[in-house]
């Protein structure tokens, strides 16, 4: 009886390696697609909200936030909607870099930490300007309106520049060493880092094109371009081979146990 039960159990047991490979393939598609959706939402939100520049006058800031209140809030909402998609992509990127880097995973950890820190800095900088727009900029003291706009600009440009550079440089090094993705992504990453350095230098400027690290908005645009290229190349590349599970031998072991 036990022998017959063991034989049936061994026959019914699914090939876990096959199901694991299918799950990995689905995850390989979902991660990059989520990244592209997140970047699309963030870009659309930025273009819709059109937050005032650092060199704008206080009157211009109040006028834009008050007159285009619904448009600004819609854009800000899209920027926050992007976060769950980008976090999903980050979980995929962590797995990709951890497999490519090997046992140490120092750069994979740095990538995850810098991306999360970048999200926190940008989101925190948008909270105050969101509150001002929601309340109505015309009823908020002008000094507070300007303070909120300046915080959003600083968080988006100069203050987030160091972690933005780390979020690109760390995965670029792994990609260059492992060739997990095309190496030209690393070269593109160096251009992004150069833009981040210019953003950080703008922290010491209160006037001109690079005030508060604005630099005509080139820094965030380059980061989005690099992240989009990363998502597209990851989606186009085949999923990395999953390790064969040791549980595939469980069927024969159960069969032998039943016979004995």
Language-model segment annotations:
Residues 2-260:
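Hydrophobic, aromatic-enriched alpha-helical segments typical of multi-pass transmembrane helices
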């Amino acid at each position: 009886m036990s022998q017959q039960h063991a034989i049936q159990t061994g026959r019914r047991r699914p090939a876990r390696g096959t199901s694991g490979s299918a799950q990995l393939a689905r995850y390989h598609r979902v991660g990059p697609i989520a990244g592209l959706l997140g970047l699309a939402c963030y870009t659309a939100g930025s273009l819709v909200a059109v937050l005032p520049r650092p060199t704008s006058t206080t009157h211009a800031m109040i006028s834009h936030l008050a007159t285009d209140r619904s448009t600004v809030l819609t854009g800000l909402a899209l920027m926050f909607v992007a976060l769950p998609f980008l976090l999903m992509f980050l979980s995929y990127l962590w797995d990709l870099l951890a497999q490519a880097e090997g046992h140490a995973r120092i750069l994979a950890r740095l990538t995850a930490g810098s991306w999360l820190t970048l999200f926190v800095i940008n989101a925190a900088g948008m909270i105050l300007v969101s509150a001002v727009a929601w309340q109505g900029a015309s009823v908020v003291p002008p000094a507070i309106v300007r303070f909120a706009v300046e915080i959003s600009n600083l968080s988006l440009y100069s203050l987030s520049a160091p972690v933005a550079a780390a979020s690109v440089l760390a995965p670029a090094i792994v990609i260059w060493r492992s060739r997990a993705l095309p190496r030209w992504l690393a070269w593109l990453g160096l251009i992004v880092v150069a833009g981040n350095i210019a953003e950080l230098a703008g922290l010491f400027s209160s006037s001109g094109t690079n005030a508060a690290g604005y630099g005509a908005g080139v820094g965030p645009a380059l980061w989005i371009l690099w992240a989009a290229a990363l998502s597209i190349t990851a989606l186009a590349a085949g999923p990395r081979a999953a390790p064969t599970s040791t549980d595939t031998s469980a069927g024969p072991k159960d069969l032998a146990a039943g016979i004995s």
